[in-house]
C-alpha cells in the first residue's frame, strides 16, 4: 500500500506520481483530494487527485516542488512507499449539465482540472479549457485535456505557446463570443482571484477549487478556514470548491503567506529537521527515569492496624511534580511524576471501605474502587490491577486525565467530614503504571466482526470491551497516529504518548486490530464494511470541527483554534522547530 508505481517529470519542478491506493481509487470522484505524508517527520500535504484507475487500484498525483515536503515527495522513486496516504477528502465537484463550461486552470492546476473536465464532458456539457502558464515548458497535460474538452485555449505570459496573455484574457475571449453558463477555476490563489473578478463582471457563476494551508485535512483543526460570504468555512470538509465570487481571496492570500519565511529558511537548510531546541518524549522520559527513584513493587505488607478515625486523620498525599527548572526545558516532560510505593499504600489507608461506596456511583465505568484500593493497601498491585481491568480498558490514561474531582472523588465520604477526598485518580495511575497485567478476553471468540470508527478514548474503550467479550474488533482511524484526542489534543506534559501507546498495545494483545489513514464515509462506506462481514459499527468520530465566534480578526495570521495549536505541537512536532 502507498507504493509509488511510476514517476515522471513534466518539467524541472513538476512531477507526476502514480501510487498504489486501491481503496482511494475505488471511492474517489472528481474534485476529491488526498493528504500525503512522505515520512514520519513530514507535513500532512493536501494534493488533488488528478486521475484514478479502479482496475489497477492506483491514483495519480501531480506535485510541484515548492517547499521541503514537496521536494521530499518529488525525490522519491518508483518502489518507494509513502508513510501515509489518506483520502478521498473534501466534497466532490458538482457535476451536471450546465451548458457551456469554461475550465480556467493555471500551472499544476491543470492536473486537478483534468478529471473535472472529463466528468463535465461526460455529463453532456460543452467544455472549453483555458490552460495557462508562464511559458511553454510549464504547460502540462495539454493532450489529455484536449481529449476531454471541446476546445483547449493555451495562454502563456511570454507567448511561447498559444496566445500571449493571462488566463483572464482567454476567459474573456470565450465570454465575448458565446454564452457561458459556468466557470470553474483551479490554480494559484492570485490567478483564481482575478478569474473571479473577470467572470463577476459578466455574471458568470464561478467555482474556485481552493488549496489552503492544512494540518490534519479531516475537519478537526480549522487551519484551512476561509471566509465565504462573510462566514467561516473549512476547505477540507466544506470544499475545496466554493463560489469564487464570495471568497475573501485577500484574506486567503495573507494566510497562505504566513509561513513563507519559515519555509524559505527550511529550504536553505536543505530540509534538515530542527532538533536543537527539542527532544523526543522518549528521550525526556528516559532522562527523567534515570533521575527519579521508581517505586519498587514490594511483597504484601501488613494490613492497616488503626481505626477508622485514624484513617480519616491521614492527610491526602501530594503528587510528586517535576521541578520547574527541569519542566521549562521541554514541552514533553511529564509534570506529575506519580507516587512512590510508600505514598500509594499510605493513601490507600485513607479509604474507609464504605458499605455503600458512592465513589463507585460517581465513576462512569463503575470501577470497584474500594476493592482495588484494599488490594493496594496490602501491597497487592497485581490484584488491584485485575479489579480495575474488569471495568476499565484505559486505566493509565484515566488515572491521569479523568476529572476525578467531578466524578468518583466528588462522591467520597471524606468530603462530608470536611476532609479531602481519597486520591483515587493518583492510585489508579500508580496501579496502571506499576502492574504488568496481561488483560485477557473474558469470553471465547464469538465469530462476529465489529468496526470502530475513530481511535480516541471512546473508540479505544469500546474496542477493549468488545474484544473482552470475544468479538473480532477493527478500529479505523483517519489520522496517521492511533489515539485520537489522547494524542493530538492533550499535551505530553500531562499525558505522554508512551502511556497511550502502552494502552494501545494492551488492546492489540486482546486481538484488536487498527487501520490508520482510513476515513469511514470516504475511503470506505458503511455498506463496504457490511460487505466485508462487519455486523456492527460503533461511531466514535470525536468532537469534529472547531467552533469560531464570527468576530473580526479571528482569521488573521497566527490566530489558531486550540485544535490547530495542539495538533501542530502534539501530532506534527512543531515545538521542535
Identify the meaning behind each predicted range.
Residues 240, 248-284, 288-442, 449, ...:
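Ferredoxin-type iron-sulfur electron-transfer modules and their immediate structural context
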Residues 68-215:
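FNR/FR-type flavoprotein reductase catalytic core
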Residues 86-97, 432-450, 567-577:
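A short, basic/flexible loop-to-alpha-helix module at the beginning of a structural domain
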Residues 1-80:
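Ferredoxin-reductase
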Residues 113, 119, 356, 452-476, ...:
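Rossmann-like dinucleotide/flavin-binding elements
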Residues 107-110, 189-190, 220, 393, ...:
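Residue-level detector of alpha-helix initiation sites
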Residues 471-487:
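Glycine-rich FAD pyrophosphate-binding loop
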Residues 385-395, 427, 486-534:
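N-terminal Rossmann-like dinucleotide/flavin-binding domain of flavoprotein oxidoreductases
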Amino acid at each position: 500500500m502507498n507504493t509509488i508505481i511510476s514517476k515522471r517529470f513534466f518539467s524541472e519542478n513538476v512531477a507526476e506520481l502514480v501510487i498504489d491506493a486501491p481503496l482511494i481509487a475505488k471511492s474517489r470522484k472528481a474534485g476529491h483530494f488526498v493528504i500525503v505524508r512522505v515520512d514520519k517527520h513530514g507535513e500532512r500535504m493536501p494534493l488533488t487527485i488528478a486521475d484514478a484507475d479502479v482496475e489497477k487500484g492506483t491514483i495519480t498525483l501531480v506535485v510541484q516542488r515548492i517547499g521541503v515536503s514537496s521536494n521530499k515527495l518529488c525525490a522519491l522513486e518508483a518502489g518507494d512507499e509513502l508513510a501515509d496516504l489518506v483520502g478521498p477528502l473534501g466534497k466532490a465537484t458538482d457535476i451536471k449539465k450546465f451548458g457551456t463550461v469554461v475550465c480556467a486552470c493555471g500551472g499544476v492546476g491543470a492536473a486537478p482540472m483534468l478529471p473535472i473536465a472529463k466528468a463535465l464532458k461526460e455529463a453532456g456539457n460543452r467544455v472549453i479549457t483555458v490552460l495557462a502558464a508562464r511559458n511553454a515548458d510549464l504547460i502540462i497535460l495539454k493532450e489529455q485535456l484536449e481529449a476531454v474538452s471541446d476546445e483547449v485555449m493555451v495562454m502563456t505570459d511570454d507567448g511561447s505557446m498559444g496566445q500571449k496573455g493571462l488566463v483572464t484574457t482567454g476567459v474573456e475571449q470565450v465570454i465575448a463570443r458565446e454564452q457561458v453558463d459556468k466557470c470553474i477555476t483551479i490554480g494559484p490563489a492570485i490567478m483564481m482571484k482575478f478569474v473571479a473578478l473577470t467572470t463577476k463582471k459578466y455574471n458568470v457563476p464561478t467555482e474556485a477549487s481552493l488549496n489552503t494551508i492544512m494540518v490534519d485535512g479531516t475537519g478537526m483543526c480549522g487551519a484551512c478556514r476561509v471566509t465565504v460570504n462573510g462566514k467561516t468555512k473549512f476547505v477540507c470538509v466544506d470544499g475545496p470548491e466554493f463560489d469564487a465570487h464570495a471568497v475573501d481571496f485577500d484574506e486567503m492570500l495573507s494566510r497562505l503567506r504566513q509561513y513563507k519565511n519559515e519555509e524559505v529558511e527550511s529550504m536553505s537548510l536543505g530540509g534538515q529537521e530542527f532538533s536543537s531546541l527539542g527532544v523526543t518524549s522518549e528521550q525526556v522520559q528516559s532522562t527523567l527515569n534515570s533521575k527519579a527513584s521508581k517505586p519498587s513493587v514490594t511483597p504484601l505488607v501488613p494490613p492497616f492496624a488503626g481505626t477508622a478515625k485514624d484513617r480519616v486523620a491521614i492527610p491526602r498525599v501530594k503528587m510528586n511534580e517535576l521541578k520547574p527548572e527541569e519542566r521549562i526545558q521541554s514541552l514533553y516532560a511529564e509534570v506529575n511524576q506519580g507516587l512512590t510505593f510508600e505514598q500509594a499504600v499510605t493513601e490507600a489507608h485513607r479509604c474507609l471501605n464504605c458499605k455503600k461506596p458512592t465513589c463507585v456511583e460517581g465513576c462512569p465505568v463503575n470501577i470497584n474502587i474500594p476493592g482495588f484500593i484494599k488490594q493496594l493497601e496490602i501491597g497487592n498491585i497485581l490484584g488491584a490491577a485485575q479489579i480495575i481491568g474488569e471495568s476499565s480498558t484505559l486505566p493509565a490514561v484515566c488515572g491521569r486525565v479523568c476529572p476525578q474531582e467531578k466524578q468518583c472523588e466528588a462522591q467520597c465520604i471524606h468530603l462530608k467530614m470536611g476532609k479531602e477526598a481519597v486520591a483515587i485518580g493518583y492510585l489508579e495511575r500508580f496501579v496502571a503504571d506499576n502492574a504488568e497485567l496481561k488483560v485477557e478476553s473474558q469470553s471465547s471468540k464469538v465469530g462476529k466482526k465489529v468496526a470502530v470508527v475513530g481511535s480516541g478514548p471512546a473508540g479505544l474503550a469500546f474496542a477493549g470491551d468488545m474484544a473482552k467479550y470475544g468479538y473480532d474488533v477493527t478500529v479505523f482511524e483517519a489520522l496517521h497516529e492511533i489515539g485520537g484526542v489522547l494524542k493530538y489534543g492533550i499535551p505530553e506534559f500531562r499525558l505522554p504518548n508512551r502511556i497511550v501507546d502502552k494502552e494501545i498495545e494492551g488492546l492489540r494483545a486482546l486481538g484488536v486490530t487498527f487501520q490508520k489513514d482510513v476515513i469511514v464515509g470516504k475511503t470506505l462506506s458503511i455498506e463496504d464494511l457490511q460487505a466485508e462481514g462487519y455486523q456492527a459499527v460503533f461511531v466514535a468520530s470525536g468532537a469534529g470541527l472547531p467552533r469560531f465566534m464570527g468576530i473580526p480578526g479571528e482569521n488573521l495570521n497566527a490566530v489558531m483554534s486550540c485544535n490547530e495549536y495542539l495538533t501542530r505541537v502534539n501530532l506534527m512536532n512543531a515545538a521542535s522547530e
